[in-house]
């Protein structure tokens, strides 16, 4: 039975009710996970499940399809990874039985590494295939055998065309950040891939939003899903400070350079709306001798990996990024997020600022707002349910904290003769 809109609404109500279990289920043992998985979680320093894990793992262990909404850093990977690992441990077959689709190379790599850590005390093998790196090493990994395959749609389609990968034995399918996959134009590839996966399977579907297009795909591929949705997903943590600065568009770089004179900003990701703006900002910061690098879709995989690793090591003070390129990036000690450009949709704002103030640490989110971006900020504030703090722009200390209104020039009509 396929999911219908009414079914999804019913599941939302059930999920809200089920959230009460998070105060009852306080250990991974109570979730029904086997000792090898509990040992791996302990090795990773995880002593109690997150809310998304409390909601998703029990129905997943029962074989139910799961439709979920959860942010980066919520424990989402373990929410689908642990049930998959337990099932593979119970009935090992030596074939690729689980497929995880992710929109970007960075996210696919991050998921694969996390699953490998969770599988540490098992015989389950994990492989990742994605574009931007050599085809041969990934082909060799597939030949060695993998119980779980993590892939981006484009590279997986390449392997399927060359018949170097098969999906005949897939029992568990995961679509992570499905909304982003569709935004990036992967829907045709995703449909072709799913068509090669057996209809009799368990499906996990995670998406930050449920647009008409996403809802249509949900109805096609999910069967009687349990919906798990955290109402707190749009509420930044209390340790996060959020400040707006009113600034003309042409003065944004000057403002950022001025703010960087504060040595407390030692590690920051600056988000731009486009790749071209990311390039210009990085070049401008270099001229001011700010240690900076950037990641976006036009950078090679090796360039992106190098930039991220050196940023984590502290060799770069600022990492300039676009939203799509930054999805899947996990930096545990990020002090600041700077919205150089206000995102076009509120969901991207929460994705951005959610990268700082993690694990009870404090963090700062700074947003530059030009007059034409004020409607976007109002949308974000409406979603938040509160007005964000306005800071004094150090470039114009005596000016208003509100963005200047666009100047309207009225021209007198020529007199009729």
Residue ranges of predicted features:
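Dual-mode signal for accessory low-complexity, basic/Gly-rich regions
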Residues: 398-417
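Conserved helicase RecA-like core
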Residues: 2-8, 14-401
């Amino acid at each position: 039975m396929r999911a219908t809109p009414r079914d999804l609404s019913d599941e939302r109500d059930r999920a809200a009710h089920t959230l009460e279990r998070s105060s009852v289920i306080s250990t991974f043992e109570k979730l029904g996970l086997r000792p090898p998985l509990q040992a791996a979680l302990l090795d990773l320093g995880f002593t109690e499940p997150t809310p998304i894990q409390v909601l998703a793992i029990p129905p997943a262990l029962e074989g139910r399809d799961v439709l979920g909404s959860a942010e980066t850093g919520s424990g989402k990977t373990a929410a689908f990874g642990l049930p998959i690992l337990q099932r593979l441990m119970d009935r090992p077959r030596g074939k690729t039985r689980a497929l995880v689709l992710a929109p970007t190379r960075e996210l696919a790599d991050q998921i694969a590494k996390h699953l490998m850590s969770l599988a540490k005390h098992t015989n389950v093998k994990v492989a990742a295939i994605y574009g931007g790196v050599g085809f041969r090493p990934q082909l060799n990994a597939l030949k060695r055998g993998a119980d779980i395959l993590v892939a981006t749609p484009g590279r997986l389609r390449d392997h399927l065309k060359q018949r170097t990968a098969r999906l005949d034995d897939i029992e568990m399918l995961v679509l992570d950040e499905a909304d982003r996959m569709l935004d990036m134009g992967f829907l045709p590839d995703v449909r072709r891939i799913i068509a090669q996966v057996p209809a009799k399977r368990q499906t996990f579907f995670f998406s930050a939003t449920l647009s008409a297009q996403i809802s249509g795909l949900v109805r096609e591929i999910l069967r009687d899903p349990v919906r798990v949705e955290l109402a707190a997903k749009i509420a930044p943590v209390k340790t996060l400070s959020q400040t707006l600065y009113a600034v003309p568009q042409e003065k944004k770089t000057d403002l950022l350079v001025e703010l960087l004179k504060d040595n407390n900003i030692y590690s920051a990701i600056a988000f731009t709306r486009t790749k071209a703006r990311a390039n210009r900002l990085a070049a401008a910061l270099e001229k001011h001798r700010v240690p900076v690098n950037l990641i976006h879709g036009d950078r090679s995989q090796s360039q992106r990996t190098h930039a991220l690793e050196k940023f984590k090591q502290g060799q770069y003070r600022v990492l300039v990024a676009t939203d799509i390129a930054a999805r899947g990036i996990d930096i545990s000690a990020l002090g600041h997020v700077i919205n150089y450009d206000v995102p076009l949709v509120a969901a991207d704002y929460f994705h951005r600022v959610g990268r700082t103030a993690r694990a009870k640490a404090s963090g700062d989110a700074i947003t530059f707002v030009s007059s034409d971006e004020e409607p976007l900020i109002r949308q974000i504030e409406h979603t938040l349910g509160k007005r964000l703090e306005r800071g004094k722009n150090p470039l114009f200390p005596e000016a208003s904290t509100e963005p200047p209104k666009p100047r309207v020039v009225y021209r007198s009509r020529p007199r009729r003769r």
